[in-house]
Every structure is written in C-alpha cells, then in structure tokens.
C-alpha cells in the first residue's frame, strides 16, 4: 500500500463519503459536445446500465489505439487530455477519451475520491478497452493524468492481465502501487519539472519502480512544464507518440 493511499484511508474514516454526481457528468457533456472539432461523441455503458460519454477519433491508417483518462472533476476534452487526444491521432493513434466519475463541484479533497469513485472508474477503463477491441483496434495503450493516473493504477491492480499493452502515466502524485512492480506492460512516467510538489517529490519512487517494469519503461521530466503541461502539449505529444512507436511495434 502506498503512503498516499494509507493517508487517504485514514481520512476516509474521519469524514463522510461523498456521492458520485451523474448530473454533473450530464452538464459537462452538454457543455463540451457542441464544441467538439475533432472526434465523435458516443456513449459507453457499464454492467449496471449506466451510460457515460466517450470521444472517439479514428486515425487512418492506425498504428494502435489509446484510451485517455482525465483527472479530478473535469471531462474527456479538458486541457492536456483534450490536446493529446487530438495530437495522437495526427501521429497515427486512434483515441478514445472517456468521462471518468466526478463528484459535486464543492468536493475539493482527494480523499473524497478514494474509494468512492474508484470501482466505477476501473469498470469504465475496462469497458473502453472492450469497445475498442470489439472493433479490431490493437494494440491498445492507456494514457492517464493526475487523479486519472491513480484510477489507472487501481485498474491495473485489479486487472493484471488486461488488454492494454502499455501505460502512459502523467502527473502521478507519490509512487506506484506495489502491484506495479510486477507489471507485465511497459510504463512511461511523465511529469513536469514545475509539477505539483507531490508529483515532483515522488519521482524517485516511481523511477525506482520502473527498474522492475518491462523493457522500454522509462521516466521523462518535461522541463518547465506544470501539472497541466500548459503550453507544452506539443512536446508532450511527441514524447508520448515516440515512446508508443517504440514499445508497440
């Protein structure tokens, strides 16, 4: 168990759990879908019948496909995720950016998210892989950012033999879970030199874990980039696409 998760669990014991806000997901969808320039909106469905938004952009020809997972309380076209889902198509990767579970706008604490939203987050990541695989898209990679990277880590803990052949992990606070040390897929860990303190301070722990990951795993620190890689998305997209080209051959 990582130190962050340990403190999160302690915090959960002290505060009431927050509720997932499906209404807010609908409002976010109504806000972003009319403004989409690249990609087609579609609905995916969980086993419980709950629909959630995804934005699909097909590369022609496609070298592979990437599922993108955004951070806390935002949407699948938000800032760095929105930029990457479009830029990766230009590099030959079909993208599927999915809406992750959100809380109400007044939820500010990290501990509100874990474990309340993680089970459905894990399922949505699995559903996205199934949808792409059913349409013949392969190989698959998962790209996550910020809180989405914790959700992705939780997904891989629950699905060690998942269909994702690679993981691009952006802006993860702290270190990877212990299960990641036995990862069967290469990992690209990317952060900014001006990232959040918890991301910067945890870089050595993530770098140590990558020593136990498969060949091709590496850590990249983008100089002068902040947590959202503002103004650096072009450089970030090149780092990601070049790495995918190498490990998904």
Which ranges hold each PLM region?
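C-terminal catalytic histidine-bearing segment of alpha/beta-hydrolase fold enzymes
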Residues: 216-249
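Short, surface-exposed "cap/lid" segments of acyl-processing enzymes
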Residues: 51, 58-97
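Short beta-to-alpha linker loops that shape the active-site pocket of alpha/beta-hydrolase fold enzymes
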Residues: 72, 99-106, 225
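The feature captures the conserved acid-bearing segment of alpha/beta-hydrolase catalytic domains
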Residues: 161, 165-229
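Primarily recognizes the serine-hydrolase "nucleophile elbow" in alpha/beta-hydrolase
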Residues: 130-185
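N-terminal cap/lid segment of alpha/beta-hydrolase-fold proteins
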Residues: 20-59
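Alpha/beta-hydrolase active-site loop
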Residues: 80, 109-135
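N-terminal signal peptide c-region/cleavage motif recognized by signal peptidases
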Residues: 14-17
